[in-house]
Amino acid sequence: MQKTKDKKNIEIIAYCLMHNHYHFLLYQNSERSVSDWLKSLFSGYVQRINRKYDRSGTLFERSAKPKLVTNDNYLIELIHYIHANPLKHGFVISPEDWKYSSLSDYLNNEASKLTSKRVISDYFSDGYSYQDSFQEYLESKKYEEDFE
């Protein structure tokens, strides 16, 4: 992922890699589309898996389901939903235990080599931490619902 991440074109706001699906929240900075970025990300991976297992064709059942983020509340709830996904699917007791997501970047209030600090610094720098916001989300049990 890090190799295909081009900071000028796409910013990874949040992500979670699951056993049978993934979630990316991406910010498009240029004319290069998110679907082009995803294609470049996965094409090499699919080719390697196909070679390794002497197979051909696609690996993924469905294509990406893009959602347009139109307001701040939707943005924050979407990030929470992404980070709570391992809990929703019963893979962990606590979302912090899932190491294949950007949750630790948010809880530690820092960007990593993959994630952008855009949302962390814009929304959670005034004393109200992401941890507080995420805890409220978990207590509301909204993660148990399908996200629209």
Task: List the predicted regions and their residue ranges.
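Short catalytic/metal-binding and nucleic-acid-binding patches
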Residues: 1-148
